[in-house]
Amino acid sequence: MYEKIPLELKQLPHWVGWKYMQHPGEDHKRKVPINAMDGQPAKSNDPTTWCDFDTACRGKERFGLDGIGFMFSGDGIFGIDIDHCYDPETQELDPAAAEIIETVQSYTELSPSGTGIHILCKGALPEGRKRRGAVEMYSTLRYFTVTGNQFGLEYPFSDCTERVAVMHRKYLGEEENAAGAQKAALPMPTGRGTNADMSVDAIL
């Protein structure tokens, strides 16, 4: 199940479990990080609540968790999260998501829902905005669920410092003019996008 997860990530003690939980008054479930050693909530600012990969996998089974996740700590690993960009029924991938995947070229997998994309990278993120529309980029004080369900071309876990700067500027960066700012603020397109078969074989 987790064979495709890069070994370099597995060797780091940044792992947690996670579980779907619904807080009172909310209409959706959150993916809450869980300390896989004791079943209590994990904290992004407390590494003592993280563990090694094998312990996270065992904790998932022991505590009946929904999955495992990776905590970012600002030590040269970051993640890109693109929500609601893939239709598993039609296998259509949003063109903007396809562009980000093709440009960054690092380990890419489907989110637990099967409709989002997570990209895990080495390197440094540019300073500035972390989220705009459906695109998020984080290197610290956040965690990503990790499925091992690799998507598209099997890009290796790579240093993306230079490549991600281009995508950060395009999708998250502050624009110098109002027209540019309005364009950048638009959410990911919701219409029909790129067919995933094409993205795997041709676009990516």
Go through the PLM ranges and name each one.
Residues 1-4, 104:
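Short alpha-helical segments and helix-capping/turn motifs at coil-helix boundaries
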Residues 5-8, 18-22, 34-53, 69-94, ...:
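DNA replication initiation modules
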Residues 12, 73-75, 110-116:
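Short Gly/Ser/Thr- and Asp/Glu-enriched loop/turn motifs at secondary-structure junctions
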Residues 17, 103-129:
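Catalytic nucleophile-His microenvironment captured as a short glycine-rich beta-strand/loop
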Residues 24-28:
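Short, solvent-exposed loop/turn elements at domain surfaces
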Residues 29-39, 111-114:
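Basic, Lys/Arg-rich DNA-contacting stretches centered on the C-terminal catalytic core
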Residues 54-60:
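A short, charged, amphipathic alpha-helix used as a generic interaction element across diverse proteins
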Residues 62-67, 100-105:
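Short amphipathic beta-strand starts and helix->beta connectors
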